[in-house]
Amino acid sequence: MEAVIKVISSACKTYCGKTSPSKKEIGAMLSLLQKEGLLMSPSDLYSPGSWDPITAALTQRAMVLGKSGELKTWGLVLGALKAAREEQVTSEQAKFWLGLGGGRVSPPGPECIEKPATERRIDKGEEVGETTVQRDAKMAPEETATPKTVGTSCYHCGTAIGCNCATASAPPPPYVGSGLYPSLAGVGEQQGQGGDTPRGAEQPRAEPGHAGQAPGPALTDWARVGEELASTGPPVVAMPVVINTEGPAWTPLEPKLITRLADTVRTKGLRSPITMAEVEALMSSRLLPHDVTNLMRVILGPAPYALWMDAWGVQLQTVIAAATRDPRHPANGQGRGERTNLDRLKGLADGMVGNPQGQAALLRPGELVAITASALQAFREVARLAEPAGPWADITQGPSESFVDFANRLIKAVEGSDLPPSARAPVIIDCFRQKSQPDIQQLIRAAPSTVHG
């Protein structure tokens, strides 16, 4: 039980963010499901075949008793389980098509969903923490060990002729830099002279006309993000900025997080609390103007993006007005240098247009804070304007629609409405009574009369 609770809690924290249920709530839900005979063991929760019966049973219980706590917890857990399963299938497909091995040839069906690795190893009493390399090694076909060399020198012992390393494995291929970034053009090329550089490490490469300078910051591969999203558009680059005692430093955004955010926007909508939590997490670091505009292009459609640009400009004008009144405003750099202006904050000043490196070098820490905060506030406004709350009162379960899909649509509409939080659960239960299919309504009519009162 404890192992399952830990696995489910971890999945909910990953896919639900701030709305994830506590371990206590998950444990109470699992205990109830076992008590009602819906689960033979806690690990049966991983089987998709048990999800619909659990949803129907918890819904009926909520309608009879008027308590929706377990139903709400199950809704979050179900969303996390579905997201984890979809991500697993996508990962296995990517491994197969890229020829990486360790994955299934075809995506698994609903009946063959696997338990998480942590749960499987806890059940066997073995140590937790098997690495991905170990799992891939177990699943990959066995190969006959043969001597392998690279060029004229053995990778393992460095001997040019007569190498005795019969079991030495081939070295990993050198990383080939993406053509998207000129600063990575020299990565992976062998040096004509001098000592060998460790494989996988980036070669220092000076900018044109500046010999001896350190390499530029690592950039997020937005081309990879675009491929994962199967979308077309101009190549984009992002550099989240972190300010420390030594000056600005850059850490690349994780493409997987951006892909997940775009998927959340597509499935949950802009007004969903889950969407807002993921956007706030991605924008918790200081971003450049180039960053925020490209991020919004990925997650917003053309019309919402135009609305966001207008709202962002209004927010930046507010910052400029405050900086004009106060010469020592953080956006003015505490009175050092020129005052901030709209061109600087939008990345349109000299040396910044289309140049994220120039933006990182010329923008002050206070300006970066203002840019990111204004972009986030503009996104909140667009979420309210571009995607008004759906009419939850008009939602009805379709003839061929599963109860789970109907419940998801209804809960999404109610959560995105202007109803106070205390009224949402009763409204959801009332809609279940009136808008569900006849068989569900029959169950409700068979319930005690207190449910209808």
UniProtKB/Swiss-Prot annotation:
- Annotated region (Disordered) at 128-150, 181-217
Give the highest taxon in the source lineage.
Viruses
Q: What are the alphabetically sorted keywords of the record? A: Host-virus interaction, Viral budding, Viral budding via the host ESCRT complexes, Viral matrix protein, Viral release from host cell, Virion
User: Where in this protein would one find the motif PPXY motif, according to its record?
Assistant: 172-175
Q: What are the site positions for Cleavage? A: 155-156, 166-167, 177-178, 239-240
Q: Where is the composition biased (Basic and acidic residues)?
A: 128-141
Pfam families linked to this entry:
Gag_p24, Retro_M
Q: Which GO terms describe its biological process?
A: viral budding via host ESCRT complex
What's the record's remark on domains? Answer: Gag polyprotein: Late-budding domains (L domains) are short sequence motifs essential for viral particle budding. They recruit proteins of the host ESCRT machinery (Endosomal Sorting Complex Required for Transport) or ESCRT-associated proteins. Gag contains one L domain: a PPXY motif which potentially interacts with the WW domain 3 of NEDD4 E3 ubiquitin ligase (Potential).
Q: Which additional comment does the entry carry?
A: Gag polyprotein: This protein is synthesized as a Gag-vMyc polyprotein.
Record protein name field: Gag polyprotein
Which organism does this sequence originate in? Answer: Avian myelocytomatosis virus 29
The upper taxonomy is: Viruses, Riboviria, Pararnavirae, Artverviricota, Revtraviricetes
Tell me the gene name.
gag
